[in-house]
């Protein structure tokens, strides 16, 4: 394994913030802060031959248009250095990756990729990072219309239809009674707050989707000072850190970024008291709905200690 400096020391433009051991993973954990860009790097160092890289951005759901999910689809379409119709599928079919994806959650968006070849991982990292920095999908709306929302007319006699990869994915959950129950729960616990917004609701809020809104989300979220980079496995981490610093991170100083206090979205005051909500979930005509019922009981755990959380989980 690579010998790294001690906590508080520096290497390749990074300062080591913390070092610890996680016996469950058989790993030494090192946390770095990149001085120029403000990015955080977490290296999980063990003997696993499977090498991993993950870009994680803090992306609170500011509304229910599923714009963060749309942006995730757009980011790995094409970029200035690697132009393509869909670079994600190019990489998937032409590289030695063992896992590759883009994932959107209610609080973050991440882009993991794995390979057993360090050289391949470096190349894939370069593609991912270039796409995060200069995505072609935000320069003109071709990719937006493909992945987000567009009108289609098959024949003159037909009605206009709404299409789009993310829109259709969300539409597929229209009658998902559990997802609709989750949405009612969030809206009841966190009325008028960011936490009430869940992903996957574009089919209900498609009028709020716009190319301009997607561009604004990119400027707000996609900067290295709002990014955690995770490295995993038995790798030449000095080589990786040098590559990240030289080719990418140092090109985007934190001082040049718009300062957005994204953490404030996760610390909004919680409505106190007991609330009750009754909601209805759509069902297709002919589907029996008499026995489809869900009763949820939710508790807000904001401000709980670690001991409290363990108690509630177990």
Regions found by a protein language model. Give the residues of each.
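N- or domain-start disorder-to-order transition segments that initiate the globular core
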Residues: 1-48
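Charge-rich, well-structured scaffold segments of protease-associated domains
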Residues: 1-12, 60, 74-83, 87-269, ...
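Low-complexity, Gly/Ser/Pro- and Lys/Arg-enriched regions
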Residues: 19-21, 286, 303
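Generic recognition of long tandem-repeat/solenoid scaffolds
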Residues: 28-34, 111-113, 277, 295-297
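Short, conserved catalytic-motif segment at the N-terminal edge
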Residues: 49-53
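Short pre-active-site segment immediately N-terminal to the catalytic Zn-binding motif
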Residues: 56-66
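Catalytic glutamate of the conserved HExxH
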Residues: 66, 70, 74
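Short, low-order "capping/linker" segments at domain edges
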Residues: 269-286
């Amino acid at each position: 394994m690579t010998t790294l400096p001690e906590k508080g020391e520096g290497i390749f433009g990074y300062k080591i913030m913390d070092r610890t051991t996680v016996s469950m993973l058989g790993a030494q954990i090192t946390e770095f802060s990149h001085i120029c860009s403000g990015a955080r790097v977490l290296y999980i160092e063990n003997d696993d031959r499977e090498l991993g890289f993950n870009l994680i951005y803090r992306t609170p759901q500011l509304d229910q248009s599923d714009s963060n999910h749309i942006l995730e689809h757009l980011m790995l379409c094409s970029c200035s250095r690697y132009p393509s119709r869909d670079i994600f599928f190019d990489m998937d079919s032409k590289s030695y990756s063992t896992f590759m994806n883009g994932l959107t959650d209610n609080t973050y968006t991440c882009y993991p990729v794995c390979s057993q070849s360090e050289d391949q991982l470096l190349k894939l990292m370069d593609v991912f990072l270039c796409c995060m920095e200069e995505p072609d999908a935000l320069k003109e709306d071709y990719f937006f219309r493909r992945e987000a929302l567009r009108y289609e007319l098959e024949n003159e006699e037909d009605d206009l239809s709404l299409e789009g990869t993310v829109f259709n994915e969300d539409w597929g959950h229209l009658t998902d009674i559990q997802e609709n129950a989750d949405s009612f729960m969030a809206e009841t616990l966190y009325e008028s707050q960011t936490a009430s917004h869940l992903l996957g609701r574009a089919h209900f809020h498609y009028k709020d989707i716009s190319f301009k809104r997607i561009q604004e989300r990119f400027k707000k979220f996609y900067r290295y000072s709002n990014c955690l980079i995770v490295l995993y496995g038995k790798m030449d981490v000095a080589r990786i850190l040098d590559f990240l610093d030289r080719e990418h991170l140092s090109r985007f100083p934190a001082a040049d970024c718009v300062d957005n206090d994204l953490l404030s979205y996760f610390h909004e005051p919680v409505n106190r008291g007991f609330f009750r909500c009754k909601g209805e979930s759509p069902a297709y005509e002919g589907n029996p709905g008499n026995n489809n019922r869900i009763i949820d009981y939710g508790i807000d755990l904001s401000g709980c200690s670690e001991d409290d959380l363990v108690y509630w989980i177990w």
